[in-house]
A protein has these predicted regions:
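Bacterial Sec-dependent N-terminal signal peptides
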Residues: 1-24
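Papain-like cysteine protease catalytic cores
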Residues: 71-195
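N-terminal regions that are enriched for targeting/export leaders
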Residues: 24-32
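Cross-family signature of deubiquitinases and ubiquitin-like deconjugating cysteine proteases
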Residues: 33-58, 62, 77
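Active-site signature of cysteine proteases
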Residues: 35, 162-171, 175-369
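Active-site nucleophilic cysteine motif
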Residues: 41-55, 95-102, 173, 308
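Structural recognition of the beta-strand scaffold that forms the well-ordered cores
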Residues: 45-48, 72-76, 104-107, 115-118, ...
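Sec-exported extracytoplasmic/periplasmic mature domains
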Residues: 51-60, 109-113, 260, 317
Length: 369
């Protein structure tokens, strides 16, 4: 989830890349409108930037209007929700920067959203020009644990052999944690003016013309039955929102159909390997097809994990005829092809944790055996 962590690995992999491709090496087959590439900088908020980019592309698709929505509004609300959940679970849940596409939609449905200009610019409150959580990440979790449980234990009390009944939450702890979050990412506005009109975050979300309940998360694993919902067992899925389980070939068909029908898709998956800084992701020297069994094996042995979220917005082909997907990242324009990656079909097939997209992009028959 961290740009600061993943690119460190990514940059070392760059030296191992067999060849450097340029954008001219790819022929666009289908390309859907997106907004500009953003930079999450030193913050573990890929899930936020990618999903708001997805929302912006949905607004473009449905209204033709361009918006720059505020990532730090979502961070503020989501981190507070996460802190409350962490305390209610007596520490037996994550409190970290990572998240998923579900989080963004849950925040918007509950609290609304605002444009970028309605809050302090990312990083400005800590003397940076972009989001910088280097200090924030060191402060937030200990603060939640101290104010929420009255202890500075870094692990759940019961895990230390001490009953959580020995600890009590400190009265007003939520206000204390909220003050810290506001200090680092900015306080969310109650009202703001946008293009001459006054909005609350809720009325602004309503004005965007999006049905926030008309979206679905799809996945593909064999440790749960196909054609049923289940919660993906990943640490950043703390809201426990379900995904609908499908065979991988069916999932790939849905992705293709959606892109070709003019929809963008939020993608959650693994970029810890074979994801080159020059803007290409593929499985080198891969002669065997990616199967459902290989995916499951790599998920089970932790070769394949959930560590990044991006936006798929198009399909392209390389000169050798190999199929790629066009992907908008959130690491600024200094990486990839000015912030765009080309991910091969087999890479996507192996490394996809979930797809998040509009229900209208999915034919109902595709969700049935």
């Amino acid at each position: 989830m961290h740009r600061i962590i993943i690119p460190t690995t990514l940059l070392s992999l760059t030296l191992l890349s067999p060849q450097i491709s340029s954008a001219q090496d790819f022929t666009v087959v289908k390309q859907n409108p997106i907004t500009s590439v953003k930079d999450q900088n030193e913050s573990g908020t890929c899930w936020d930037y990618a999903t708001l980019g997805f929302v912006e592309s949905e607004i473009l698709r449905t209204t033709g209007k361009t918006y720059d929505l505020c990532e730090m509004f979502v961070v503020n609300k989501d981190y507070m929700d996460c802190a409350i959940h962490h305390v209610r679970m007596h520490g037996f849940s994550q409190i970290a920067e990572g998240g998923s596409a579900d989080d963004v939609f849950e925040v918007i449905k509950k609290y609304g959203i605002c444009p970028e200009e309605a809050m302090p610019a990312p990083g400005s409150l800590v003397g940076d020009s972009l989001a910088n959580f280097n200090e924030f990440r060191k402060v937030l979790k200990p603060a939640v644990q101290y104010f929420g449980t009255g202890t500075n234990h870094t692990y759940p009390a019961d895990a230390l052999g001490v009953s959580s009944k020995n600890f009590k939450t400190i009265p007003g702890w939520q206000d204390s944690v909220q003050t810290i979050i506001d200090r680092y990412v900015g306080k969310c506005p109650e009202k703001f003016v946008y293009e001459g009109k006054t909005y609350t975050p809720k009325t602004f979300a309503e004005s965007l013309g999006i049905d926030w309940n008309n979206y679905i998360s799809l996945t593909s694993f064999t440790h749960h039955p196909f054609y049923e919902d289940f919660v993906i067992e990943a640490m950043h899925k703390w809201r426990l929102r379900p995904s609908f389980n499908l065979p991988i070939d069916r999932l790939m068909s849905i992705l293709d159909n959606a892109i070709n029908a003019g929809y963008c898709v939020a993608w959650g998956g693994d970029v810890s390997g074979n994801f080159w800084a020059n803007g290409e992701a593929y499985l080198p020297n891969s002669k065997l097809p990616v199967t459902q069994e290989i995916r499951q094996q790599q998920w089970d042995d932790w070769t394949f994990t959930y560590d990044h979220v991006m936006l798929i917005y198009g399909i392209a082909k390389k000169a050798n005829g190999k199929k790629y997907y066009m992907v908008k990242n959130s690491w600024g324009t200094q990486y990839g092809h000015k912030g765009i990656w080309y991910m091969s079909e087999d890479f996507i097939k192996l490394n996809t944790t979930y797809l998040f997209l509009c229900k209208d992009a999915v034919k109902k028959k595709m969700l049935k055996p």
